[in-house]
Regions:
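Walker A/P-loop NTP-binding motif of AAA+ ATPase domains
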Residues: 1-138, 156
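C-terminal engagement/docking regions of AAA+ P-loop ATPases
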Residues: 136-152, 163-226
């Protein structure tokens, strides 16, 4: 087992002159000092999407340059993974082969994955998942993201508290009904991301036939219906 370090790009940038560059160098130094390790750069687009902008006096570009140079020249056994909600905002230099070994696309959770997400969040709030109709929750949350499901559970907990009762299936079903999922609010953007991923990324999991009736081709030559 290797240590996992989470680097939040949004917290790298500081208000003082030179603070951002110092922060990224310190983060790299820490990762190297405990290598072999895994460095997880969370929501990488938060820090690198503005590299061509002059609005920050070139700070983003300098941070980006530091990361690129380290990725290219590092000798320490540090395995780098990064997540992005909008990969199209990233500089093209970061996406070329050699920076990352592979780019994977993770779609909205499948039915079985949604069941697991419900269980995780119910356990987090000290509720026994076995007491709830998890399978039915999953069926009714087609198109929900993991964050949507988390908010459903939180909303249901507030609802049960306001009613002076213990959380039950009804509270959760009501919360599901009130929630507009990501697949609806970001339908066009989600379609664009899927098409981009189909041409440029490896599909991390095969989606179930759930979401819209749209059909896309994936790189293996098979067709998957959404």
């Amino acid at each position: 087992k290797l240590p996992l370090l989470r680097l939040d790009m949004g917290r790298i940038f500081g208000s003082l002159v030179g603070a951002s560059e110092s922060n990224i160098r310190m983060a790299i130094k820490i990762a190297e000092s405990i290598s072999p390790s895994i460095l997880w750069i969370d929501e990488i687009e938060k820090g690198l999407s503005g590299t061509k902008s002059e609005g920050d006096s070139g700070t983003s570009a300098r941070v980006f340059g530091t990361i690129l140079t380290w990725m290219q020249e590092k000798e320490s056994p540090t395995f780098i993974i990064a997540t992005a909600n909008d990969i199209e905002r990233l500089p093209p230099e970061l996406l070329r082969k050699g920076r990352f070994d592979e780019i994977f696309f993770v779609d909205l959770p499948t039915s079985k994955e949604r069941e697991q997400i419900f269980k995780i969040h119910l356990k987090k709030f000290k509720r026994d998942p076995e007491k709830y109709n998890i399978a039915e929750f999953s069926k009714k949350t087609d198109g929900f993201s993991g964050a949507d499901i988390e908010q459903v559970v939180i909303d249901a907990l507030f609802d049960s508290f306001n009613k002076g009762q213990e959380l039950d299936n009804g509270n959760i079903f009501d919360a599901i009904h009130r929630t507009v999922p990501l697949a609806s609010t970001m339908k066009e953007k989600l379609s664009e991301i899927r098409k981009w991923a189909n041409e440029r990324a490896v599909i991390a999991s095969l989606p179930e036939k759930e979401i819209s009736g749209e059909t896309i081709n994936i790189s293996s030559g098979r067709q998957i219906e959404f």
